[in-house]
Amino acid sequence: MEKTLETVPLERKKREKEQFRKLFIGGLSFETTEESLRNYYEQWGKLTDCVVMRDPASKRSRGFGFVTFSSMAEVDAAMAARPHSIDGRVVEPKRAVAREESGKPGAHVTVKKLFVGGIKEDTEEHHLRDYFEEYGKIDTIEIITDRQSGKKRGFGFVTFDDHDPVDKIVLQKHHTINGHNAEVRKALSRQEMQEVQSSRSGRGGNFGFGDSRGGGGNFGPGPGSNFRGGSDGYGSGRGFGDGYNGYGGGPGGGNFGGSPGYGGGRGGYGGGGPGYGNQGGGYGGGYDNYGGGNYGSGNYNDFGNYNQQPSNYGPMKSGNFGGSRNMGGPYGGGNYGPGGSGGSGGYGGRSRY
């Protein structure tokens, strides 16, 4: 018995990798320091790391940072206690996005709706509810069926009352529902995908990380790759993401990297996940404004056959993005630098953080 009590915490620590214990904190006052950030978040548990990201040249706060707890339960407790206010300012905590995910369009968008793929014919709404309600309060569940045959099309949507359950579910990746492997990802509406595309196209350079010509491709020094934002220096509140220790940033934008796979100009569910073909030109055929992402054709592992016909929504062009997601450096930041016109959050340049 004594051995069991000793080994369980060790096993739990092994299971809970850093990516499950880290929070991105956006909207920080420029007066907030590591000390005040740490003091605030320690009320929910022990922090193993805490950092306020700063401009490498001026050392001025860039208005966001990261805190890492010792357990995922502490992260859950902190997120359950929102809103958070530090130094007189309401901040925006969000589960940090891991490096391998931060390059995907839409990875940093905050949504309450979850896409669930791999739904078998014997899976009913109550199976989804029983599984997902442990993550948060569910508003609606939809399992999409074929209008003519009435058969399940293999996917559905779960809408929560908050974005955090979606972030947590997507972060954990592997899910088994009613004995079947399921694929989960954020469900982006047509409008949200258009916003992602707009941010990825660079808007004249803003949000664009250049063309991967310099710094070994670390975000590139392309003209205008300055991520210059509004008064808070966040790129008008979109896409904070530095990538501390390889973690992408906060809400909005989805502006990292140039990986294809997200639906074309008409929206879609993107994701770069191969194997989901489409029926009628995409998931739902524009169902509820969630047009068909570019899931390819054929089978997705054991998620069932979705190869009726390939999507007619092509992959989104990567615009002026180099596609490199090399986030080198001790803070996973790659070459941040002050950027073209700098602002208070300029990417690009050659200075290492």
Curated annotation (Swiss-Prot):
UniProt gene name: HNRNPA2B1
Modified residues (Dimethylated arginine): 203, 213
Domain RRM: 21-104, 112-191
Residue positions, PTM Phosphothreonine: 4, 140, 159, 176
Residue(s) carrying Phosphotyrosine: 331, 347
Residue numbers spanned by region Nuclear targeting sequence: 308-347
Identification of the protein by name: Heterogeneous nuclear ribonucleoproteins A2/B1
Location in or out of the cell: Nucleus, Nucleoplasm; Cytoplasmic granule; Secreted, Extracellular exosome
Domain text: The disordered region, when incubated at high concentration, is able to polymerize into labile, amyloid-like fibers and form cross-beta polymerization structures, probably driving the formation of hydrogels. In contrast to irreversible, pathogenic amyloids, the fibers polymerized from LC regions disassemble upon dilution. A number of evidence suggests that formation of cross-beta structures by LC regions mediate the formation of RNA granules, liquid-like droplets, and hydrogels.
PANTHER family referenced in this protein's UniProt entry, alphabetically: HETEROGENEOUS NUCLEAR RIBONUCLEOPROTEINS A2_B1, HOMOLOGOUS TO DROSOPHILA SQD (SQUID) PROTEIN
